[in-house]
Amino acid sequence: AELTSCFPVDHECDGGASNCNCCGDDVYCA
């Protein structure tokens, strides 16, 4: 599932997670 809380999407910000959104210091991973 995609998280749309922040953009851009599809950043691998959480090692191994393929669908993450980064917003400042916050990372949202599906």
UniProtKB/Swiss-Prot annotation:
Keywords: Disulfide bond, Knottin, Neurotoxin, Secreted, Toxin. It comes from the Eukaryota. GO terms for molecular function: toxin activity. Expressed by the venom gland. Disulfide bonds join 6-23, 13-29. It is found in: Secreted. GO terms for cellular component: extracellular region. The keyword Disulfide bond applies. Belongs to the neurotoxin 04 (omega-agtx) family. 02 (Tx1) subfamily. The presence of a 'disulfide through disulfide knot' structurally defines this protein as a knottin. Lethal neurotoxin. Causes spastic paralysis and death in mice in 4-6 minutes after intracerebroventricular injection at dose levels of 1.5 ug per mouse. This is U5-ctenitoxin-Pk1b. The lineage of its organism: Eukaryota, Metazoa, Ecdysozoa, Arthropoda, Chelicerata.
